[in-house]
Every structure is written in C-alpha cells, then in structure tokens.
Amino acid sequence: MPYLNNVPQNKFSIRLFDIAIVLLTLKMLVSSIPVFDFVFPQKFQNILVILGYILIFLHIFEKRKYTLQFIISIILITTLLLYTSIQMQNYVYFTSWFMLIGTIHYDLRRVIKIIFIVSLSIMFISIFISLLMYIIDYKREILINIRRNETVRAFTFGFIHPNKFTIVLSNLCLMFIWLIKDRLKYYHVTFCLFIQLFFYFSRRLEQLY
C-alpha cells in the first residue's frame, strides 16, 4: 500500500482535485481547438496547467503520508515523463500522469464524470461556434481540412484536425458507456454508433461547395 496512514479525504481536498481535473481537461481540449484561441490564448492555457498541477499536488499530499518507496517511484516516473514531454514539446502525457496519480484512493467514477461533462460542454460549444463561423463566412480556412490534392475537404467542427474531433467524440462515447455500464442497454451502444457515423459523414464537405 502506498499509504503509511490512510486518511479519509475531506471536502476541501475533493474540491481541489475536482477543480484541477476541470482545468487540465479544459487545457487539453482547447489547445486542439483553434476557434477558442481568442478566448483562451496560450498564456492563459499555461496558467490553467500550472494551477491544475498545484491543486493536484496539494490534493495528493494533504494530510497523507506515503512510503519512501512510493515517493521515489512517483519522482522517477514524473521526472522521466517531464523530460520526455520537454523533448517532444507535448505535455499531454505529463498532464495525464498528474491526473492519474491524483486518482489514487479517489472516486474514479467522479473523475470520469467530470471529464465527460467538461469534454461534452466544450465539444458542443466548438460545434456551435464553428457552424456559426461557417455560415457567416468568417475564417472558414481554419474550419476546413483539405487532403489528397484538394479532392477531399473535411469540416473540423472547430478542432485542429477532423481526426482530433473524431478522437474526442470516441472518448466521449466510451466514457458514456462506462458511466452507465451498470444499466447499459443495446440502444445505448446503437446511439453511440449512430452519433459516430453521423459526424463522420457530416464532416465531408464536398456537398457544401
């Protein structure tokens, strides 16, 4: 067991980690959505990450004691991931690691639910803004991905790439299924499949030109 003394979480620590999950999920999503650049500039996104890390750090060590072996393991893995992230100039894995260690002896369902709600909200906002921008013909170039010698045009729904939108949508479907796994029915899976197919065919824009 990583704990020397397993102390129950108080309400303050729960709120800390909830806020951290919201901030880090928000950062990971908006960094892939160019239409949010005017609302969440890069400096603001960096502030979100730093605040998220601080809150998780406070959450992990508040009124808890860990074994030396556990602390050394966490430091080594964190250092390795930080070095890798710096070399790759991509902090997704490092952020995911922080979120993972924060869930130790924590309600995983609560974490998944928060990520699901934040992701779904951001996706809805991105879809709405991108469709509005397309309709009023404002910066359409950031909404359309052109491939195969301009023969394939795909609507990004505000994301940096249509495949990124598909990944987030797939993650939402998986989280939805996991959250309702105790009462999962065939029509839930059918609904998720329908949503995936609907957006897959909707993003192809040949018919809009």
Locate predicted features.
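Hydrophobic transmembrane helix bundles of membrane-integrated enzymes that assemble
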Residues: P2, P8-L29, P34, F44-Y209
